[in-house]
Amino acid sequence: MQITVLGAGAWGTAVAAQAALRHPTLLWGRDPAQMAEIAATRRNQRYLPDADLPARLVCSGDWDAALAHVSARAGTDADANGAGLVIVATPMAALREMLARIPQGLPTLWLCKGFEAGTGLLGHEIAREVAPQLACGVLSGPSFALEVARQQPTALVAASQHESVRDAAVRALHGASLRVYASDDPVGVEVGGAVKNVLAIATGIADGMGLGLNARAALITRGLAEMTRLGLALGARAETFMGLSGLGDLVLTATGDLSRNRRVGLRLADGQTLAQILAELGHVSEGVYSAGTVLERAGRLGVDMPITAAVVAVLQGGLAPRDAVAALMQREARAES
């Protein structure tokens, strides 16, 4: 099985390292110099400096070579194990471009989480627009890139309407340290991956303010309710949000100190400006970029998301963290739902 991973950030590098343990794998990045350095040092010094990469992982900045690697056997083997797989590991902002450039015959997964800025679309909706014939899906779940690259135990979910894509994801990545479950609810899996980033910022704010473990538990639980309401309005199944891509990813991102979104919340509570925080992080924090889009999409659907609304107000500078917490606590009493 031939695998190409498009995007040499931390997560793309980690997934490529896992895939290379079992299959011929190529990691592609936009910067040929960076890819040459990764190939020579077997480390991604910019995004994942603390993980050694397998010697058999091929690194390239050549787009044509990346597609040729995975196209060589796709569709030519009677044995399904010979089919190739493309894994898109770019930020959400580049997913549309990537999907439009991938040949329609190649099974494809994306790793990015969030709603597309401007359109408010999820990944599967973008795919429907730009590559309607592409067999594709999403790989998501509670996972920090460094732990995956170091082969620490992790469980993910591959969601697609195409059984061939789900099967390819399991064949490509399921192994001793990585379990991959299959799902046919990409909507639910994507909503979970998008909303948990915003909720992690909220939890980071609460923890940074020293509000205690009770407050953390309340935010995670009520945040899960927000996530589920939005997902149901978009056509997802409720049970998906109790799985890896919903509750699992939310708990990890909201409580794990490797989470960039959580760190944004912690620093906002400490009085730093958003500009200062993003400059210091140096990497993408999807929750910052997707929070407003999540709230806008929810508004169009008539879905109430008070925690998300509070995060957006803080990120936009219209509300201090302490005032946001006070506003949430002063909401009218209601039945739990």
Curated annotation (Swiss-Prot):
Example of a GO biological process term: phospholipid biosynthetic process
PROSITE patterns: NAD_G3PDH
Entry's EC annotation: 1.1.1.94
This protein's UniProt keywords: Cytoplasm, Lipid biosynthesis, Lipid metabolism, NAD, NADP, Nucleotide-binding, Oxidoreductase, Phospholipid biosynthesis, Phospholipid metabolism
Cited SUPFAM superfamilies: 6-phosphogluconate dehydrogenase C-terminal domain-like, NAD(P)-binding Rossmann-fold domains
Localization per Swiss-Prot or TrEMBL: Cytoplasm
Chain residues that bind NADPH: 11, 30, 113, 145, 260, 284, 286
Molecular-function GO terms, alphabetical: glycerol-3-phosphate dehydrogenase [NAD(P)+] activity; NAD binding
Protein purpose: Catalyzes the reduction of the glycolytic intermediate dihydroxyacetone phosphate (DHAP) to sn-glycerol 3-phosphate (G3P), the key precursor for phospholipid synthesis.
Family: Belongs to the NAD-dependent glycerol-3-phosphate dehydrogenase family.
Name of the protein in question: Glycerol-3-phosphate dehydrogenase [NAD(P)+]
Species of the source: Leptothrix cholodnii (strain ATCC 51168 / LMG 8142 / SP-6) (Leptothrix discophora (strain SP-6))
Organismal lineage: Bacteria, Pseudomonadati, Pseudomonadota, Betaproteobacteria, Burkholderiales
Gene that specifies this protein: gpsA
